[in-house]
């Protein structure tokens, strides 16, 4: 199993620190990189604009994906150097950097020859845990080298860390790092040749296809109409967390909370209940959230957006970049029955996956004023299901590497929830604004949701009545 926590909670074992930084020559090549006609993806453009706006307001938004894992013995620096550089040269998502040439237009610069990309190791002496956390959190998305890799060498083991701008990657990077850095390193130190990998896909190609696809959309396109209808049912935007979150006009850092929902046996019984209802585990996850919201707010319809990977082709599955999209989910819960909620939730999720290829930002661009659509407001709610009981994530989750994922804990305006299924348990992790009102609301939501999971698994869930 791997854990998800905030970076401020990380206290690594003492040891010497070696970090891989972009070489001066590579930085010079990046500065000289010509302008590319490839547009940023919608995800990248939205992220860059949010980052610029936060900086202008003196706010510090989360922008990194940070991972660590442990390995026994002393690090073979030469082997690790090979693995890291091979990874960076292999994936074109690391080959570009961006700048604003006016208020809104974003320009991409691309290094033409991957061989010009090189990171070199440097030792950092006498760095405290606080200094190390600050060091890992420094990459920002408007610099080319918005990534850091390093190791902390202790007496009998070392900790590897990677800090990569979300601009370049999405959660699927977990499996990529496991293969291309951990397994590559292990092969090399074991005396084997470098692992043979299939050709990587090009994220640039995805950006071009996405731009062409979204440019062809109109307000009459079926996928756009479905987004407009969903937003219209949520006050013209994306769904809001249903319970009070305090004063969100005041910046709050993010707080992360993880709770166990079910053990392995309960998870198996819960899955059986989902199948009996005509759904999969994922449909049951959204059904439990819907029924919890009904208990807490007396609602008759549950709306939420969930993240999903939009990779579909074999080439895309070999491509590193930011492919994550949003799927709108609607679940009527007036009956208070788990079976009907799970079945409808599964249908809503499955039938809505094609909407993940339509960024909500593009819908807002197309919408006429009379539609009443507007950007998400502070307190919007995003819920995700992560199944680490099956490949490829199970390989990482079931390893003995002590694999950890870190959130930076910077300013948080929304509620992000991940239901995580592992081989031996199912957990929920929630990131939310760190204030007493939001903390109480999230705790109440988790308690209601956990009760429904357990009662469903135990076969004791009767028809739920609001407020019960």
Swiss-Prot record:
Enzyme Commission code: 2.3.1.288
Q: Which GO terms describe its molecular function?
A: acyltransferase activity
Q: Which InterPro entries match?
A: CAT-like_dom_sf, Condensatn
Fetch the Pfam families from UniProt: Condensation
Q: Which domain of life is it from?
A: Bacteria
Please name the top-level EC class of this enzyme. transferase
The Gene Ontology biological process annotation of the record reads: cell wall organization; lipid biosynthetic process
Q: Which UniProt keywords apply?
A: Acyltransferase, Cell wall biogenesis/degradation, Lipid biosynthesis, Lipid metabolism, Transferase
The region annotated as signal peptide is none
Quickly give the catalysed reaction. Answer: 2-O-sulfo-alpha,alpha-trehalose + hexadecanoyl-CoA = 2-O-sulfo-2'-O-hexadecanoyl-alpha,alpha-trehalose + CoA
Q: What role does it play?
A: Required for the biosynthesis of sulfolipid-1 (SL-1), a major mycobacterial cell wall lipid. Catalyzes the acylation of trehalose-2-sulfate by adding the palmitoyl group at the 2'-position to yield the intermediate trehalose-2-sulfate-2'-palmitate (SL659).
State the family it belongs to. Belongs to the PapA acyltransferase family.
Protein name, UniProt field: Trehalose-2-sulfate acyltransferase PapA2
Q: Which gene encodes it?
A: papA2
């Amino acid at each position: 199993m791997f854990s998800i926590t905030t970076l401020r909670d990380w206290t690594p074992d003492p040891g010497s620190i070696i970090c891989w930084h972009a070489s001066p020559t590579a930085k010079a090549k990046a500065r000289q990189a010509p302008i590319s006609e490839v547009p940023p993806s919608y995800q990248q453009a939205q992220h860059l604009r949010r980052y610029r706006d936060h900086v202008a307001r003196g706010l510090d938004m989360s922008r990194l994906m940070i991972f660590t894992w442990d390995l026994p013995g002393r690090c073979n620096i030469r082997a690790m150097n090979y693995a890291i550089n091979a990874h960076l040269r292999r994936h074109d998502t690391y080959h570009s950097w961006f700048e604003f040439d006016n208020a809104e237009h974003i320009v991409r610069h691309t290094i033409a020859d991957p061989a010009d990309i090189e990171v070199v190791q440097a030792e950092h002496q006498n760095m405290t845990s606080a200094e190390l956390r600050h060091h890992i959190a420094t990459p920002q998305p408007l610099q080319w080298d918005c990534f850091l890799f390093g190791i902390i060498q202790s007496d009998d083991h070392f900790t590897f860390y990677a800090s990569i701008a979300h601009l370049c990657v999405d959660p699927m990077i977990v499996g990529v790092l496991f293969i291309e850095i951990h397994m590559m390193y292990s092969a090399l130190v074991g005396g084997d040749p470098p692992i043979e990998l299939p050709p990587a896909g090009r994220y640039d190609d995805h950006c071009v296809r996405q731009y062409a696809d979204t440019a062809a959309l109109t307000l009459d396109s079926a996928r756009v109409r479905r987004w407009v209808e969903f937003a219209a049912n949520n006050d013209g935007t994306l769904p809001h967390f249903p319970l009070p979150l305090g004063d969100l006009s005041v910046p709050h850092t993010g707080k992360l909370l993880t709770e166990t929902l079910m053990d392995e046996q309960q998870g198996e019984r819960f899955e059986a209940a989902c199948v009996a209802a005509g759904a999969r585990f994922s449909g049951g996850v959204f059904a439990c959230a819907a029924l919890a919201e009904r208990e807490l707010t007396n609602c008759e319809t549950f709306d939420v957006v969930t993240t999903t990977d939009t990779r579909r082709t074999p080439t895309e599955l070999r491509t590193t970049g930011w492919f994550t999209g949003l799927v709108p989910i609607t679940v009527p819960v007036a009956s208070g029955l788990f079976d009907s909620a799970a079945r409808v939730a599964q249908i809503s999720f499955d039938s809505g996956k094609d909407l993940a290829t339509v960024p909500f930002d593009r819908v807002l661009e197309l919408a006429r004023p009379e539609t009443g659509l507007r950007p998400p407001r502070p307190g919007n709610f995003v819920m995700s299901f992560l199944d680490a009981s099956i490949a490829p994530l199970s390989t990482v989750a079931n390893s003995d590497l002590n694999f950890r994922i870190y959130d930076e804990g910077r300013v948080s305006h929304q509620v992000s929830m991940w239901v995580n299924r592992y081989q031996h348990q199912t957990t929920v992790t929630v990131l939310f604004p760190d204030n007493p009102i939001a903390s109480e609301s999230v705790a109440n939501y988790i308690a209601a949701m956990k009760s429904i999971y357990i009662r469903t698994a135990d076969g004791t869930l009767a028809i739920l009545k609001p407020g019960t």
